[in-house]
């Protein structure tokens, strides 16, 4: 079962639908409606931290979940979830040079993790005004995807099964969204 933590974003339900279409059992919980003890009782095999309209500091239990389950349960962070993952390990989340709300752009990737077997570059949909500051990304993460302007679009922990993508694979305008999420499920 996948636990999908909803950071009060409508795209959470697109993620839910995509994962269900891929055959996964998914339970959705709001970021302020569960505790670590509740998560332990649910016993998820994977955790997904959803997009959301806020900063990682305002994303309810998301940071605590990442810190507590890192290295124990595979996790994927999407947009805000990606930012929260980086921040949980010490990176700074800063204003992007250009706001990208509902815009598509090409993203180049290294073919690893969730990008395995996908063409590069990919056209993806972006909805964000914040990004992970590359100068502050800890060494425990590798950058797996980047925009034309070298903004971080994907990260992967070097030892643990943790990955984040800044863009929205669940958006209809993103290429290979199902395939990317399927790569996460296969682990």
UniProtKB/Swiss-Prot annotation:
Keywords, alphabetical: Folate biosynthesis, Glutamine amidotransferase, Transferase
Protein name: Aminodeoxychorismate synthase component 2
Gene that this sequence comes from: pabA
Reactions this protein catalyses: chorismate + L-glutamine = 4-amino-4-deoxychorismate + L-glutamate
UniProt enzyme class: transferase
Superkingdom, natural source: Bacteria
SUPFAM superfamilies named among the record's database cross-references: Class I glutamine amidotransferase-like
Protein source organism: Salmonella typhimurium (strain LT2 / SGSC1412 / ATCC 700720)
Disulfide-linked positions: none
Its EC number(s): 2.6.1.85
GO molecular function list: 4-amino-4-deoxychorismate synthase activity
Keyword Amino-acid biosynthesis: no
Pfam families recorded: GATase
